Design a protein with these regions (language model features):
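Charged helix-capping and loop-helix junction motifs
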Residues: 121-131, 161-166
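Short amphipathic alpha-helices and their capping/turn segments at secondary-structure boundaries
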Residues: 42-54, 93-99, 133-136
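Catalytic His-Asp segment of secreted/periplasmic serine-dependent ester chemistry enzymes
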Residues: 17, 153-231
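N-terminal cationic-hydrophobic initiation segments that often serve targeting/anchoring roles
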Residues: 69, 98, 132, 136, ...
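N-terminal secretory targeting modules
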Residues: 1-56, 62, 66, 70-71, ...
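A short helix->loop->beta-strand "cap" motif at the edges of active sites that frequently abuts
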Residues: 139-143
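Conserved beta-strand scaffold positions in the cores of enzyme catalytic domains, especially
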Residues: 56, 77-79, 181
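Oxyanion-hole/transition-state-stabilizing segment in secreted/luminal serine hydrolases
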Residues: 62-78, 87-125, 145, 149-153
Length: 231
């Protein structure tokens, strides 16, 4: 083997390995969330969260769901939403804010910020698939529920892409074991197909309690199927 081949071979092998690696393994560390994740871990150290419960994870719409325990009485819930995050951020931190809790069910809301930051619907679908693959590596039988990307006034111009992402994720999840797509879109739109302003805060993006009431109503029967009936 000549010298050029010998020196080029490691580069080729590295390139092939990079292609073979799952998407979640090649993402750079999302350092902007270091403080949030450290705060979660400090809280876990002070008081261990319930095992085998229902883990809510995703962006600020999860983070601001401060009434989780009241909305699902008797259900061991954990809130690990961190504001502004995209799907890939949750994927990167699975080993720190998912796996340690051994949840029976994971409820994810994310994808909204992804599209707002320029991701295509196709990329959102791929990122969610990568999240599922990463979770399955540690928790092969956990049930994963995806809450559809919600319509909002602030991001109304992006709604076609969000709707496309919803449809693609729903289609991909359909018929697969331990996966469930929960679509509450219609309840959040008015008769003209516009986002219902009364469900949203002044920023036109985040939800008021009335919006969370819609999510709660949509999720209660789903969680009951998984053995988490509310009291």
């Amino acid at each position: 083997m000549n010298r050029a081949c010998r020196t080029g071979l490691p580069l080729v092998l590295a390139w092939l390995l990079a292609l073979a690696a799952p998407a979640w393994a090649t993402q750079p560390p999302p350092s902007q969330w270091t403080a949030d994740i450290a705060a979660f871990q400090a809280r876990d150290h002070e008081q261990a969260p319930p095992q085998h419960g229902v883990l809510f994870i995703g962006s600020s719409s999860i983070r601001f769901w401060t009434s989780l325990a009241q909305d699902f009485p008797g259900v061991p819930v954990i809130n690990r939403g961190f504001g502004g995050s995209a799907i890939a951020d949750s994927t990167f931190y699975v080993d720190r804010i998912v796996t340690p809790y051994h949840p029976k069910v994971i409820v994810m809301y994310a994808g909204d910020n992804d599209i707002a930051e320029g991701a295509s619907a196709g990329q959102v679908i791929k990122d969610f698939q990568a999240f599922v693959a990463r979770v399955r590596k540690d928790l092969p039988t956990v049930d994963i529920v995806y809450l559809s990307i919600k319509p909002s006034l602030a991001r109304q111009a992006l709604w076609p892409a969000m709707r496309e992402a919803n449809a693609g994720i729903a289609q991909w999840m359909r018929g697969k074991p331990n996966l469930r797509f929960v679509d509450d879109t219609q309840a959040m739109l008015d008769a003209q197909g516009h986002p219902r302003a009364e469900l949203l805060r002044e920023d036109g993006l985040h939800m008021k309690p009335a919006g969370y009431a819609i999510w709660t109503a949509a999720l209660r029967p789903v969680l009951a199927e998984y053995g988490f009936a509310t009291h």
